[in-house]
């Protein structure tokens, strides 16, 4: 694992006291990290591009909503670890081109895509993943009309400027759009230099993957492969049965498989005599699927963490 310091610590400011409301000034196709709650909460990637970590609490459960733009990696972790509640910040380091967070209580360093502590008091430990999903804002609002959305935190961020010094944030800007369109991947590719090689032809390095882990087992579900399977895949990960849905409007979602045979019906799925919403796991008759604790990330980041064999194949 290659670790390097690329910007000063906290040059990208984490959010410690998030506020929420019902209004979001962005576009309907803007992606948000959605976390269940009463009411559900949405964290727009347009804001997370400039902050990368939001320290929050949901129903008394301290959580960290985390985002690494270079790895396309969205994951929500529990902040209660080792008998204390941790507060996370952005270390300014990358590990295999992935965000390295640090906790302000022990200054231990944590790899964002895996949740593993790579240096410090908790080295070798792994944070607990919380159920979450990444979906377009339009899908979140349609599925959760009672939901709330993170309001603009404001301030300065290194991601807002051209150098290493923080600059005033303009949330109307999208600093990673050009990177997402390039063939290369990783930190150097962000600056237009492709120094890493990708030796697979079956999927691209920045293919979106839904990562599911169960015990020591890990399986990544590439978005186009699930869509190519009529939008639904049912398989086992470790000792747990999983069902993964993917649609054009709602994105990719993973749930515990109840054992039904799902069939695509437009943007929904039919099983056991009723229709199921893939974005929420809710059925028309009131039943609800159990959302799995998953990550959303690019294929290269999943492969960095789990190896080339850790992908579902049709």
PLM features per residue range, with description:
Residues 1-314:
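Mid-to-C-terminal functional-domain signal that highlights helix-capping/loop sites
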């Amino acid at each position: 694992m290659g670790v390097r310091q690329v910007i000063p610590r906290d040059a990208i400011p984490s959010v410690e006291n998030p506020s929420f409301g019902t209004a979001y000034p962005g576009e309907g196709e803007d992606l948000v990290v959605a976390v269940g709650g009463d009411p559900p909460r949405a964290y727009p990637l347009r804001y997370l591009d400039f902050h990368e970590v939001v320290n929050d609490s949901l129903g008394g459960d301290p959580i960290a909503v985390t985002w690494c733009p270079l790895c396309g990696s969205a994951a929500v972790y529990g902040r209660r670890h080792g008998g204390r509640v941790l507060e996370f910040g952005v270390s300014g380091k990358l590990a295999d081109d992935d965000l390295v967070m640090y906790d302000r209580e022990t200054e231990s360093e944590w790899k964002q895509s895996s949740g593993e502590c790579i240096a410090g008091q908790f080295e070798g430990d792994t944070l607990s993943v919380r159920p979450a999903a990444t979906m377009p804002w339009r899908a979140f609002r349609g599925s959760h009309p009672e939901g709330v959305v993170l309001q603009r935190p404001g301030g300065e961020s290194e991601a807002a400027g051209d150098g290493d010094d923080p600059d005033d944030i303009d949330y109307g800007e999208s600093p990673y759009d050009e990177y997402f369109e390039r063939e290369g991947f990783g930190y150097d590719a962000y600056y237009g230099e492709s120094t890493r090689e990708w030796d697979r032809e079956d999927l691209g390095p920045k293919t979106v993957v839904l990562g599911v882990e169960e015990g020591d087992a890990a399986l990544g579900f590439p978005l186009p492969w699930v869509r190519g399977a009529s939008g639904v895949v049912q398989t086992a990960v470790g000792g747990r049965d999983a069902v993964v849905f993917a649609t054009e409007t709602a994105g990719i979602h993973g749930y515990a498989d109840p054992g039904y045979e799902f069939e695509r019906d437009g943007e929904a799925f039919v099983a056991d005599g009723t229709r199921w919403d893939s974005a929420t796991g809710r059925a028309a008759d009131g039943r609800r699927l159990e959302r799995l604790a998953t990550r959303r990330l690019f294929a290269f980041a999943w492969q960095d963490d789990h190896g080339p064999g850790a992908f579902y194949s049709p």
